[in-house]
UniProtKB/Swiss-Prot annotation:
Protein name (database record): Aspartate and serine-rich protein
Provenance organism: Lottia gigantea (Giant owl limpet)
Record's keyword terms, sorted: Glycoprotein, Secreted
Entry keyword Glycoprotein: yes
Biased composition (Basic and acidic residues): 141-161, 173-223
Disordered: annotated segments: 112-230
Gene Ontology terms: cellular component: extracellular region
Residue ranges with Acidic residues bias: 126-140
Lineage start: Eukaryota, Metazoa, Spiralia, Lophotrochozoa, Mollusca
């Protein structure tokens, strides 16, 4: 085998071609390496970009999910607060309603008790009783009548001769229930001073000449027509 110098001396053109080919091969290899490195770098950069974008998207998605969870938590808190306010309002309303009902019941009871008391006073305050009768026979005389119209509880406006149940025309000794059966005009032993038939001893059950029905006031009794005098 000949050396490089010998071959160059014999065929210089061939040697030059080989050198050029070697240069192309080396240059192509370098370019290939550079290209591979560039591709790897670009892939690395692209991968990093993809990872970054993926992380960003993941973060956004996670944040959205966290936001949803927070919103749900806030909704629960809001519902609890609304429920608490509603329960408090119901309790206050029920308490107020109970107080109003109790107050109304107290007022009704007070009104009923007041009505009963007023009725008792009216029933007990009857001034038309036989014990308080101011028209006593012991003080009754035609000349000295102490039963004036001002004290007469039976007003004269209601007295009429037509309604007189103890009229002088009908007051005979046989029908007189005021112990007139023993009284006579000529032998009158029932004097005013000894008259024992006072209204204070007359009970309401036997007294048929009560003040409530007595329409024969003294102002219309005259001595001339009085046949039933004490």
């Amino acid at each position: 085998m000949t050396s490089y110098d010998e071959e160059a001396a014999i065929n210089p053109k061939a040697v030059g071609n080989k050198s050029s080919l070697l240069k192309y091969i080396i240059g192509g290899g370098v370019l290939a390496v550079v290209g591979v490195v560039a591709v790897m770098v670009s892939l690395q950069v692209s991968g990093n970009l993809v990872k970054s974008e993926a992380n960003t998207l993941a973060a956004q998605s996670s944040g959205a999910q966290r936001g949803d969870r927070l919103d749900l938590d806030n909704d629960d808190d809001l519902e609890d607060e609304i429920k608490e306010i509603d329960d408090k309002f119901k309790k206050e309303f029920d308490t107020l309603l109970d107080n109003v009902i109790q107050e109304v019941n107290k007022q009704l009871k007070a009104d009923l008790n007041g009505g009963a008391t007023a009725g008792g006073v009216n029933n007990g305050g009857d001034t038309d009783e036989s014990s308080n009768d101011t028209d006593e026979d012991s003080n009754d005389s035609d000349s000295k009548d102490t039963d004036s119209d001002s004290k007469d509880t039976d007003s004269d406006s209601k007295d009429s001769d037509s309604n007189d149940t103890d009229s002088d025309s009908n007051g005979s000794d046989s029908k007189d229930t005021d112990s007139d059966s023993k009284d006579s005009d000529s032998k009158d032993t029932d004097s005013d001073s000894k008259d024992t038939d006072s209204d204070s001893k007359d009970s309401d059950s036997k007294d048929t000449d009560s003040d409530s029905k007595d329409t024969d006031s003294d102002s219309k009794d005259s001595d001339s027509n009085d046949t039933d005098s004490d």
